[in-house]
Design a protein with these regions (language model features):
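Interfacial loop at the N-terminal end of multi-pass membrane proteins
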Residues: 2-80, 106-128, 160
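Hydrophobic H-region at the start of alpha-helical membrane spans
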Residues: 9, 83-87, 137-142
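Hydrophobic alpha-helical membrane-insertion segments
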Residues: 15-16, 85-101
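Transmembrane alpha-helix boundary/anchor motif
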Residues: 21-25, 95, 99-102, 147
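Hydrophobic residues within alpha-helical transmembrane segments
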Residues: 52, 56-59, 88, 133-136
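Transmembrane alpha-helical segments in integral membrane proteins
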Residues: 60-71, 138-159
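Alpha-helical transmembrane segments of helical membrane proteins, especially in multi-pass transport
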Residues: 93, 97, 135-142
């Protein structure tokens, strides 16, 4: 049981840590690399890796939490707030990974270097809107993750009392 709880905290902590670190990678990439296109590719690939970390870690968290509930309470308790938050985090991450990013990639393939397009270009506006959506998704996942970390900490601390 302690090992399950350790895995819950580890998986959630790694995911939250990656979400916090990604903007740092982005800032350094855009300030140090010779072109915005190259920096964008570094950030894109980092984000894809982050999503796989999140999807696998989130799945592990959910599985361990359900098993922990079964052991300690005799039921899986699917509708716990912590499970709902994790499912929302996983859904948002999947939307970004399998919908938003591929659409951004398609625009890049069509237009080439997005940063060279005029600001009023329809492709540029569409890309910027998708980029904004992607940013908001990551912010939402981070906020939900922090809330979930707090709730999980509180739940597991009160379970010991």
């Amino acid at each position: 049981m302690n090992f399950l709880r350790f895995l819950m905290f580890l998986s959630l902590g790694v995911w939250i840590g990656c979400l916090i670190f990604l903007p740092i990678v982005a800032q350094i990439s855009f300030s140090m690399l010779p072109s915005p296109q190259l920096a964008g590719m570094v950030v894109r690939n980092s984000l894809l890796a982050l999503h796989w970390i999140g999807l696998s870690g989130g799945g592990l968290f959910l599985l361990c939490s359900l098993i922990d509930n079964r052991i300690t309470r005799g039921k899986f308790a699917w509708l716990r707030l912590s499970h709902i938050l994790m499912i929302v985090m996983l859904a948002l991450t999947a939307i970004s990974q399998f919908s938003t990013i591929p659409r951004m990639d398609a625009l890049r393939a069509t237009a080439g270097e997005i940063s060279t397009l005029p600001a009023d270009s329809p492709i540029r506006r569409q890309f910027d809107a998708l980029h904004s959506t992607s940013t908001h998704i990551e912010e939402a996942v981070l906020l939900l993750g922090i809330i979930l970390l707090y709730l999980t900490s509180r739940r597991l601390t009160s379970a010991r009392s």
